[in-house]
Structure formats: structure tokens, C-alpha cells
């Protein structure tokens, strides 16, 4: 019995040493490139704090881009210190927690060195490659034109993503027909008023998410929201205003006054989707939204008969579980009076 126990113990120690040896070999690689996920506890090792930037060792960017799908040890992550290097390396399927993003790319304080974005080439066109970024330094990736498409940023600093660089005087409405902002793009409240014109909103129709308390301004007036119909996710408070405010001179959410409140077609030639409206904020339950309308467990009963139900918002309309009541939209159980 003792011999068997000794053999088992020795084999376990050998296996442990072998695993540690392999891990040690892996950790010498300094490449942080594609499909790399860093836990929050170690993210600050990717790039040191800004004041440590100049004293940190440099690495060759060309060597870093050769490897894929590799997880490096924390003791080697601090080798990636060059902001331009980080912009090139951290480019695909890279997840960064909000609280640590400031250490991924050092703070960009030198305003005179900021890259200007031409008015005919909006910053939003340079956002790329499934990059999830949060926090105050996301503008670094935009101004350097390093990321393009599938870009997610936070509410506070969204204005740095699209046409609000005060230092570069980029202030104009983006023409979506030309700029093609139509895939996996999340618009935040601070800049959503730039997209208030219906002709712009009509073009935004694929994988488009409009969060926040000012999101309704993105699709003003109401008929603009009809084209936003694929994989539309509308999170956060008051976001029900995305569908559909009505009237050029008002940010209030009006339902078009169709005769007899029956199915009708809007007069706009570009908008021919049929709607069945019944109430000011509450819509009559109609056929069309049968699946992919998710709620939290506590509100699960609403799946069968949601108050917010628009016929042609028809593909994977997802509602986060943390605030489902804001989508239906009951707004703490108090609804405006029905339209007469």
C-alpha cells in the first residue's frame, strides 16, 4: 500500500513539474495579438501607468504580430509599452475591462499631436475588428485610425468616437448613406443628437444598438425607426423612445395618428412598413415578434404578450435582463393616456 502511495505521489509531482515547465516556456512569448482575453486582475500589466511609460522596455511590434491565440503570463505583459504598438496589437476580439483600459494605452495629453479627422472621412469609419473598449482612452484608437467596425465605447466618451473633436473642428452631421455606419455600432447618448435627421436614421439598419436616455433623438422623427429592424438591441433607461418618436419639432414620443388606429402605411415613400398602433407609449400586441424577445426571469411572463410590440422590428430583438420594464415600455407602471 505504501509503495502504491509513493508511486502515485511521485507521478503527481512529475506531472506538476511538467505543466509548470510548459507554462514557463509559454510565458517567454511576449505576443498579445488576436483573440486574446485578459482578466481584470492582470490587465494593468499590458501597459504600465503613463508615468512609467518612458522607463519601460520596448518590444518590436513586427515580432508581436506573428503569433495568434496566445495567452502570455503577467510578468511578460509589461513589455508592451509603446502606445502605437498597442494600437496595432490590440486589434481583434480583444476584451478589456473598463476600469483598466487606461493602462492599455497611456493617456493622450498632447493635444497638438492628435490626429485630425477630415470632415469627409468621419472617425466612425475607422472603427474596426470586433474591438471592445471601455473608458476614457478609447479616443486614442480612433484618432490613430487603428480600429474599425464593431466598436463599443462608453457613454461618457462616446463623443470622442464620432465627429466631436473640438480641437480639429469636426462638427457636422454624418451622412449615413455615404458613410455606411451600419454594422455592429453602438451609439451613446452624448452624441446621438447628431443623428436626428430622418434621412440619416433610415440608413442605419443592421446590428444597430441605441442605448441611453437620449437615444430617441437618433431616430427622430418616428418613421425613421422603421428601417432599424435587424438585430436591434435597445438597452438602458428611456430607450423605448427609440421606437418611434414622431414630429420634426419635438423630442416627445408620438404615435402617428393613423385613421381608426388600424394598420396603415406611412406617407413617406421610403417607409412602407405596416404598423398597428394603439396607444401613445403602449403598442397593441400584433403578430410579428414571436421569438428572441427576452426578459429577466422575474419578468418572464411578458414574453408571451409584451406591451411594446412593433410588427417589423423582427429579428432577434433582445432585451437585457437588468431593466426589461424599460423596453415594454411601462415606465414604472404609468402610461400616458391613449390617443384619441
UniProtKB/Swiss-Prot annotation:
Its main location: other. It comes from the Bacteria. Keywords: Signal. It is found in: Cell surface. Residues 1-26 form the signal peptide. GO terms for cellular component: cell surface. Adhesin that binds to the host cell extracellular matrix proteins fibronectin, fibrinogen, collagen, and vitronectin. This is Extracellular matrix protein-binding protein emp. It comes from Staphylococcus aureus (strain N315). The gene is emp.
Amino acid at each position: 500500500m505504501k509503495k502504491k502511495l509513493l508511486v502515485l505521489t511521485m507521478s503527481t509531482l512529475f506531472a506538476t513539474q511538467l505543466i509548470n515547465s510548459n507554462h514557463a516556456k509559454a510565458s517567454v512569448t511576449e505576443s498579445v495579438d488576436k483573440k486574446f482575453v485578459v482578466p481584470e486582475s492582470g490587465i494593468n500589466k499590458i501597459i504600465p501607468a503613463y508615468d512609467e511609460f518612458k522607463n519601460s522596455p520596448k518590444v518590436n511590434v513586427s515580432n508581436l504580430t506573428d503569433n495568434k491565440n496566445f495567452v502570455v503570463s503577467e510578468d511578460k505583459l509589461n513589455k508592451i509599452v509603446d502606445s502605437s504598438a498597442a494600437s496595432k496589437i490590440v486589434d481583434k476580439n480583444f476584451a478589456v475591462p473598463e476600469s483598466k483600459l487606461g493602462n492599455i494605452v497611456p493617456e493622450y495629453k498632447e493635444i497638438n499631436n492628435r490626429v485630425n479627422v477630415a470632415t469627409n472621412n468621419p472617425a466612425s469609419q475607422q472603427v474596426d475588428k470586433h474591438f471592445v473598449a471601455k473608458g476614457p482612452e478609447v479616443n486614442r484608437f480612433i484618432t490613430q485610425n487603428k480600429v474599425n467596425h464593431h466598436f463599443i465605447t462608453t457613454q461618457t466618451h462616446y463623443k470622442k468616437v464620432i465627429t466631436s473633436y473640438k480641437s480639429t473642428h469636426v462638427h457636422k452631421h454624418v451622412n449615413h448613406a455615404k458613410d455606411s455606419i451600419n454594422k455592429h455600432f453602438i451609439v451613446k447618448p452624448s452624441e446621438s443628437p447628431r443623428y436626428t435627421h430622418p434621412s440619416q436614421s433610415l440608413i442605419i439598419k443592421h446590428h444597430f444598438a441605441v442605448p441611453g436616455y437620449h437615444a430617441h433623438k437618433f431616430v427622430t422623427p418616428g418613421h425613421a425607426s422603421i428601417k432599424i429592424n435587424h438585430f436591434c438591441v435597445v438597452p438602458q433607461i428611456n430607450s423605448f423612445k427609440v421606437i418611434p418618436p414622431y414630429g420634426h419639432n419635438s423630442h416627445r414620443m408620438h404615435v402617428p395618428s393613423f385613421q381608426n388606429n388600424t394598420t396603415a402605411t406611412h406617407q413617406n415613400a421610403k417607409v412602407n412598413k405596416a404598423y398597428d398602433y394603439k396607444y401613445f407609449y403602449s403598442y397593441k400586441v400584433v403578430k410579428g415578434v414571436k421569438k428572441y424577445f427576452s426578459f429577466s426571469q422575474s419578468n418572464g411572463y411578458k414574453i408571451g404578450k409584451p406591451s411594446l410590440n412593433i410588427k417589423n422590428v423582427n429579428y432577434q430583438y433582445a432585451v437585457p435582463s437588468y431593466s426589461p420594464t424599460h423596453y415594454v415600455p411601462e415606465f414604472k407602471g404609468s402610461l400616458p393616456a391613449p390617443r384619441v
